[in-house]
Amino acid sequence: MSNCASVALKGIPRDCASSVGGINRVAIANYSDIKTVTLSTGSADTAAEITQIELKPEAKWNFYHFRKGSSSLVETLNVDQATGLNYVSSELVMTFARMESAKRAEISALALNEIVVVVEDSNKQYHYLGYSEPVAASAGTGQTGQAKGDANNYSITLQDDSETFPYLLSPECAGTVFSTDN
C-alpha cells in the first residue's frame, strides 16, 4: 500500500464531450501467452497507460463481437476503512445471441482458462483486465426464453480483481492488439 500522504490530488475538470455507454468488442488471450506488458509511468499531466503488450511467439488474440446493447463492463471500487481493504472488482458480461454448439464450446473454454482481456468501449477507450492477476469466469447462463420475443442466448461473466481500476491502452497499443480483427 502506498503512503497516503504521497498521493497527490489533481481534480477532474468538467468534460463537455459526449459519452456513450456499452462495449463494441473484446480481445482475449491466454494469461500464460503474455510475454510483457509495458506500463508508462505517467507524469504530472498524464495518467499511466499501457503502451505495449507483447505476446509469446505463436500466441494470438481472439476477438468477440456482440449485438448493440447486449454486453457491459462494470468496475467497482471496494473499500473497507476498518480493515484497510481497497481493491477494484471488474466484471465483464458478454452476451452472445442464439444458442449454438460453437458458442457453447467457446463459453465452456472461457470458463476454464486464465486469461487477459482488452475491452473496447463505445467511446473508443480500451480497458486492460488481467494486469495484476488472471481474469477468470465467475458466472454464466444459457437461456432459451419463454415467449417469441424473449432472448435466446449465452452469457458469461469474466471477473478481474485488481489494486486499481483497469489501465487504459494507448491508441497505438490498442491498434496493435486489434490489428488482426477482421
Describe each model-derived feature in a short phrase:
Residues 101-108, 167-169:
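Short, conserved charged micro-motifs
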Residues 107-129:
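Short, acidic/charged, Gly/Pro-enriched secondary-structure junctions
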Residues 80-101, 150-164:
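Oligomerization/assembly interface segments of phage tail-like spikes and tubes
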Residues 133-182:
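Mixed-charge, glycine-accented linear interaction segment located at domain edges/termini
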